[in-house]
Amino acid sequence: MLYELIGLVRITNSNAPKLEAKELSSTIGKLIIQNRGVVRDIVPMGIRYLPKIMKKDQEKHFRAYHFLMLFDSSAAVQSEILRTLKKDPRVIRSSIVKVDLDKQLDRASSLHRSLGKKSILELVNEDYQSI
């Protein structure tokens, strides 16, 4: 089944804001691959201010590094990933959404679909033509 993970990662070092998000996404990716899953795409969305001050583990956060991950896995692995994310102190908020694959197997992430791209193949062809 295809899932989409949206994560908000804390920023501890202003000089290297991507560091913890990169470590977290590689940890989650390894967990998916070890359990016979496939990571389709990781979309870094950059640093954004949060709509309100959020608390996690007695820390207050007003901005976070956002990322989106598109992956295939079983339902058991998906719930294990969510459990791991809830325990991780680097994660401020996370959400996993099941992507509907009724008519199309090559599905882009919700972020890319909002920009008008319908499949990952369209994104790859666009990147290839720009080179």
Curated annotation (Swiss-Prot):
GO terms for cellular component: mitochondrial inner membrane; mitochondrial small ribosomal subunit; mitochondrion. GO terms for molecular function: small ribosomal subunit rRNA binding; structural constituent of ribosome. It comes from the Eukaryota. InterPro entries: Ribosomal_bS6 (IPR000529), Ribosomal_bS6_sf (IPR035980), Transl_elong_EF1B/ribsomal_bS6 (IPR014717). Keywords: Mitochondrion, Ribonucleoprotein, Ribosomal protein. Component of the mitochondrial small ribosomal subunit (mt-SSU). Mature yeast 74S mitochondrial ribosomes consist of a small (37S) and a large (54S) subunit. The 37S small subunit contains a 15S ribosomal RNA (15S mt-rRNA) and 34 different proteins. The 54S large subunit contains a 21S rRNA (21S mt-rRNA) and 46 different proteins. Component of the mitochondrial ribosome (mitoribosome), a dedicated translation machinery responsible for the synthesis of mitochondrial genome-encoded proteins, including at least some of the essential transmembrane subunits of the mitochondrial respiratory chain. The mitoribosomes are attached to the mitochondrial inner membrane and translation products are cotranslationally integrated into the membrane. Belongs to the bacterial ribosomal protein bS6 family. This is Small ribosomal subunit protein bS6m.
